[in-house]
């Protein structure tokens, strides 16, 4: 069972994601809304995957959270944002555009888990999904 931390400033969206993930066999290690809370929860609960909103409740950016994580052994990171062209996303594996469908969030997490485990991303990719690591070996891209 993969452990996921949700970092999202919109509590309704965070609750929706938590319910969806639990229904599909994930363990949700918590919900964070700020940079400090996210980093502390990641270090304490060591999630396998992080759903990381770009804009956080404290005005910070999700990229600031990702930058604080050590590369070896860091969790897989799926950014979620309403404006994918707004900021250069770094230190993550993929990005999913908001609003997203349940099926797209689940598939996006599955792909990020595959990247962490194998270094490869296997299509099909969800609607509004973008790989962020050019070194990722994608079977059909």
Language-model segments: which ranges?
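Active-site residues of response regulator receiver
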Residues: 53-54
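CheY-like receiver
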Residues: 107, 114-141
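A Lys-centered signature of the CheY-like receiver
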Residues: 98
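Two-component/phosphorelay signaling modules centered on CheY-like receiver
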Residues: 10-30
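Acidic, metal-coordinating helix/loop segments flanking the phosphotransfer/catalytic sites
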Residues: 18, 31-49
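Short amphipathic alpha-helix used as the core "switch/output" element in two-component signaling
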Residues: 60-75
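Acidic di-acidic motifs
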Residues: 8-9, 125
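Hydrophobic/aromatic residues positioned on beta-strands within the core alpha/beta folds
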Residues: 80-81
